[in-house]
Amino acid sequence: MTKVRASHLLVKTEQEAIELREKIVNGELAFADAAAMVSLCPSGANGGDLGFFCKGQMVKPFEDACFSMEVDEVSQPIQTQFGWHLIQLTGKAD
């Protein structure tokens, strides 16, 4: 079974996610630093690292994004019932 490893940050608004993504992809801000500074998720303290997980362990929109990404890619903002996420895929394993 394929597993992925991802880091994420969680914010309240799409606009905040868009602005953070722009800074991250332009190299102005490291993903882990952004997560530590602004994420509403407790994982922010670890740079947003969620570790490895399989399909069925995360909410569907989040999971769908993770399993369609390439390693080191930063997602567009993803909305879930928790808020707006940016995801950075950090690994894949079989």
Report each predicted region and the residues it spans.
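Proteostasis/folding factors centered on peptidyl-prolyl cis-trans isomerases
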Residues: 1-10, 37, 61-94
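Well-structured core secondary-structure elements of compact alpha/beta domains
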Residues: 1-26, 42-57, 87-94
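Glycine-centered tight-turn and secondary-structure capping sites
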Residues: 25-32, 72
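Short, well-ordered alpha-helical segments enriched in acidic and aromatic residues
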Residues: 32-40
